Amino acid sequence: MTDPLAFRVMNEIGIIDQLGSTLFERSMPRGLTLPQFVVLNHFTRVGGDRSPVELANAIQVTKATMTSTLQRLERKGFVTSAPDATDGRSKRITITASGRKARDQSIKAIAHHLAALETAIGKKQLEAVLPVLAALRIFLDRQRDGD
């Protein structure tokens, strides 16, 4: 019996995620972990500030895990935290210029792998798959949020 098409697609994406994460972790600048990069990349992609809970939900980790990651990033000067103006119990986290630089350096560190991928698969094929992947992400985001 053949597995359902959607399962096979998700299975491939999961394997790609594991392989890509391993490759990325091996190439990251010293002292930066993949979870820390993910937070920096999230800020770069969406902009603005976020609460630790908002970040934990967006990245699909526990609040405790996010708090630990944010503390490490703050010690490195990659994010800042300030009291929430509307809710004094919460904090608002913002990426710093150093955080953006660390994120950009991480991408530069894997540039040769990205170039090899583009050569092996082809720019046109990668461009063709990108809208499908974006649609999958949007669908899964809505499922996560209960829409």
Protein language model regions, located:
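Short, locally clustered residues in the helix-turn-helix/winged-helix DNA-binding domain
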Residues: 14, 41-47, 107, 134
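C-terminal regulatory/oligomerization modules of transcriptional regulators
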Residues: 1, 123-147
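N-terminal helix-turn-helix DNA-binding core of bacterial DNA-binding proteins
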Residues: 22-65
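N-terminal positioning helix adjacent to the helix-turn-helix/winged-helix DNA-binding module
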Residues: 5, 35-36, 51, 98, ...
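Charged, amphipathic alpha-helical coiled-coil/dimerization segments
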Residues: 71-131
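DNA-binding alpha-helical recognition surfaces that contact promoter or target DNA
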Residues: 68
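Generic structural concept
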Residues: 10-17, 96, 130-137
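N-terminal leader segment of winged-helix/HTH proteins
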Residues: 1-30, 76
